[in-house]
């Protein structure tokens, strides 16, 4: 009996654990501190800084099953998903990694043992082929002489993509960053399937399928194309879980493995589909994986960056559900089946199930409102189409009006063998794309980040002032030996009390001082293992090797500590009041305010806000001790410490607890006791995206300032109402009641005046072939009174056509009324349109009543004068 996908995942991790590898959890799909990536798209992403020498781990061998998304940017598989056997937006990458430990020999031997060993995957050796980079004689020799693969099954691949190092067997993540030659392992499905070995003209067939890529990480590619040797040669491997599952389960398509079979059946159930071979089922089964995990990792549908990619995938899935005949929202119903089939890899998704379902349901409902109209428009355009290409302007209109991503339009067209003029679409989109490029940091040069080889020791938990030695200086991102007065720079010290921005807490400010110089620090940031002090040298000169006195702004740090501790209390209080589904989605802890984004599907009620505020203040009054303990990550989680999903933690972590009320992993700075916070007040609660709420709050002196400000406002209002703050509510209610009474009396007077005006107007009507025509501009009449006046005049005049106008603050308001017996000849909508056009406006309505507005008041007299001739012509 073949292994399930979950069993294959576990077997891979168990094998490498037995070879001394640390099993590391999958990182978030949102890359941590990497400006070059839209999404995590490979197992090595979370180790990129390790390969570059910017980060250190307490292990030199690691293994992971990494969640990946490829649906945007360079690695974009979206358009092929559902139409091929192996393309996915979401997949799991099994990998083993060596950080300066083993290299080519062990990497190849490990792979061979796992794939062919009787106790592991037990694949037939004669079915395996390998490729190596053309000049990598070492890897070739290991495969031939040590593993024993015949030469005819070892293929050298050169630079087959038109440039040096541009090869299927030379791996690089992007234009810059870690790279190196690789060896790939292929599985031969047999001669009953069409296709040839890698490097042959038939290599695109499905017979020979790549199952494992082993990269020998030797270089860091610079922006100018040069290759710098990495500090230590390393190994990065990747094997798609879905691909190896297809091989081990003896199927030729990833969509036939147990995981996808289960999901496809679930899709069929919620959409009512009966043909399990329908490609739309495959599309939706794939897309629920990427969408659910992206939302769980904090990405929300939007019109930019990651949120837009998510929106595109959701909408593509919804459109395919529509094709299958789904009559109601269905996509969110697949989250439950997905959690079941993912096993241990779906634990975080299970914790956030309600939140993920709500986000997907809301997005589907929003799109469903425009999907039908958009598809109707597209059908119209395709019916009129002459040729085989839809113009870019129509594709843009579908995007702009109905929210159709261009790839969704292309998807519909593809089914009818029609192409989309994507160049024309891009032209129409250029202005929006230009703005998006300016706002986005994605695609930046990874090497543009300051690279510091040294490390800084942070001593700010216990010290706000100490001496440190300058180990590096940077001006405009480039290392320098010295700076002079007036220059802005980044100063790196061997040890520092300054806290670098992390975990939502802002970086410290202060001064670096010495004999004859002062450097004003206005921010502190991390650069790998180093801490950089950003600021300006206000006096003197500073050079590498100098000793400085580092002084943190103590008062500012104190306010930050209070706000950070209050954030932890509020997080715990929110979970108590709203439920365990509350999860942090973002935070800002500054000296002035704390801001906390969290998952929750509706606005908080005033009573809930008050309850959270009261609960936090109760913990402040308890004056709980705030304690920190350093322990192993798994032990901390076992103790119940909350870890922020997507945050990167070391194996040993800092656990911060506040009595029995809150326990979290946190590297920030905090008060000593909760009583130090003094007072906590929530100043706003709002929504930032579907399923995400935001609270802003203040503490200590800031909280007292809001109390005083509120008291001052109440006293000001009481003074205006000639009362005091004790009976303010009664006073305001009395004023509002009196105001309502006066408004009612005023309306009655206006109605009487309108009736009198109508009576006097009726005498001004002229007779046109038995129809009374009344055209008049009224001064000092509110626009909303015109309709009442037209109704009164109709009753008085019998067979009639009426046009009334008024001008308020330079804007023209028009109304036309036509008695029922005349609407066959004169239609109010046409009449009002003719008049409105002359005053720079437009309008419409029913044949017997129509309204319009305009902006050209000066043209009104002439427009009204034209009515009689227009009506006369209609009455002929």
UniProtKB/Swiss-Prot annotation:
Binds 1 zinc ion per subunit. CDD domains: AlaRS_core. It catalyses: tRNA(Ala) + L-alanine + ATP = L-alanyl-tRNA(Ala) + AMP + diphosphate. One of its GO terms (biological process) is alanyl-tRNA aminoacylation. Gene3D superfamilies: 2.40.30.130, 3.10.310.40, 3.30.54.20, 6.10.250.550, Bira Bifunctional Protein, Domain 2, Threonyl-trna Synthetase, Chain A, domain 2. Pfam families: DHHA1, tRNA-synt_2c, tRNA_SAD. GO terms for cellular component: cytosol. Disulfide bonds: none annotated. Zn(2+) binds at residues 564, 568, 666, 670. Its cofactor is Zn(2+). Keywords: Aminoacyl-tRNA synthetase, ATP-binding, Cytoplasm, Ligase, Metal-binding, Nucleotide-binding, Protein biosynthesis, RNA-binding, tRNA-binding, Zinc. It comes from the Bacteria. InterPro entries: aa-tRNA-synth_II/BPL/LPL, Ala-tRNA-lgiase_IIc, Ala-tRNA-ligase_IIc_anticod-bd, Ala-tRNA-synth_IIc_core, Ala-tRNA-synth_IIc_N, Ala-tRNA_ligase, Ala_tRNA_ligase_euk/bac, DHHA1_dom. Catalyzes the attachment of alanine to tRNA(Ala) in a two-step reaction: alanine is first activated by ATP to form Ala-AMP and then transferred to the acceptor end of tRNA(Ala). Also edits incorrectly charged Ser-tRNA(Ala) and Gly-tRNA(Ala) via its editing domain. Consists of three domains; the N-terminal catalytic domain, the editing domain and the C-terminal C-Ala domain. The editing domain removes incorrectly charged amino acids, while the C-Ala domain, along with tRNA(Ala), serves as a bridge to cooperatively bring together the editing and aminoacylation centers thus stimulating deacylation of misacylated tRNAs. Homotetramer. This is Alanine--tRNA ligase.
